Regions:
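A short, active-site helix/loop in glycosyltransferases that binds the activated sugar's phosphate group
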Residues: 142, 149-182, 193
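Short, structured helix-loop element that forms part of the nucleotide-activated donor/catalytic region
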Residues: 172-175, 235-244
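An amphipathic, basic-hydrophobic alpha-helix
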Residues: 81-107, 117
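Short beta-strand->alpha-helix junction loop in the catalytic core
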Residues: 137, 165-166, 184-195, 242-243
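Conserved donor-binding/catalytic core segment of Leloir-type glycosyltransferases
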Residues: 23-24, 160, 191, 197-215, ...
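Short His-centered aromatic/hydrophobic patch
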Residues: 109-116, 133
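N-terminal strand-loop element at the rim of the active site
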Residues: 3-16, 20, 26-35, 44-86, ...
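Acidic anion/phosphate-binding donor-loop and adjacent secondary structure
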Residues: 141-143, 171, 185-203
Length: 244
């Protein structure tokens, strides 16, 4: 599980620990961790692991896929009694069952599912858990109230947000001067720079996003209508699924 030119990686402090710490990453149940149908979260997780100085320390857990990424450690899990618990909590229970008889990870990173992070913390309060947020948590189960977010922040080791906006959403209504608020941090998504020089550009705006209300596609379309009203040489393309 290594990148091309992996020998050029800088040495990480984690490399010298013995035994090396293991970091488990739990995906939302709808994510498909493979090159064919990877969602946005799967893509980000895959890229971040490969960009890490210690990619071999990560283990990704998620719904079974026919062909997972072959350059990152992946363990497929079938949600436990999804008919009763729901699919995401069922996946969390399958993960907890997987831990039985195995060494505990140094960190459990739960992506995008606040109620899953809370559930794992309630069952295994001894496990350090990082909640990784890609969207507004105020619309999510398990964090849609100030009280719920206060409870989350107490039980999480850290809350990682992909933007300052998402960080502000999580802290909305909370006392930002409280020491616990320092657990909420921003870690922006990166991108690999493929081009050595700027390419020639055309007057086109490309929007790659799910076409659903929570992604703000309607507000975006309305804004573009106003901005481009007197710019007939510009055009817009939108690429994205409607039901994912």
């Amino acid at each position: 599980m290594s990148l091309p030119h992996n020998e050029h990686r800088q040495t990480s402090p984690l490399d010298i620990l013995s035994p090396p710490p293991q970091i488990d990453i739990l995906l939302p149940v709808k994510e498909r961790f493979g090159p064919k149908n990877a969602g946005a979260v799967s893509g980000v997780v895959h890229d971040l692991i490969l960009a890490s100085q210690t990619p071999d320390l990560f283990n990704v857990f998620g719904h079974p896929v026919e062909t997972p990424f072959d350059d990152v450690s992946f363990t497929p899990l079938t949600p436990h009694r999804a008919w009763f618990h729901g699919r995401n909590i069922g996946l969390a229970k399958a993960y907890l069952n997987h831990l039985n008889g195995r060494p505990d990870p140094a960190l459990v990173e739960v992506h995008g599912r606040c109620h899953v992070a809370a559930h794992i913390s309630a069952i295994r309060p001894d496990l350090p858990i990082a909640l990784y947020l890609h969207n507004d948590p105020r619309e999510m189960k398990g964090s849609d109230s100030v009280a719920a977010r206060q409870k989350l922040i107490r039980s999480m080791a850290v809350v990682i947000c992909v933007s300052d906006y998402i960080k502000g959403c999580f802290l909305d209504g909370l006392d930002v001067k409280d020491a616990l608020s320092t657990k909420v941090v921003t870690a922006r998504n990166g991108a690999h720079r493929w081009l050595q020089a700027p390419s020639q550009k055309t007057n086109m705006i490309l929007i790659a996003s799910r076409m659903v209300p929570e992604k703000g596609i309607l507000e975006c379309a309305r804004a573009l209508t106003q901005v481009l009203a007197d710019k007939p040489d510009w055009h817009v393309k939108i690429a994205g699924a409607r039901r994912f």
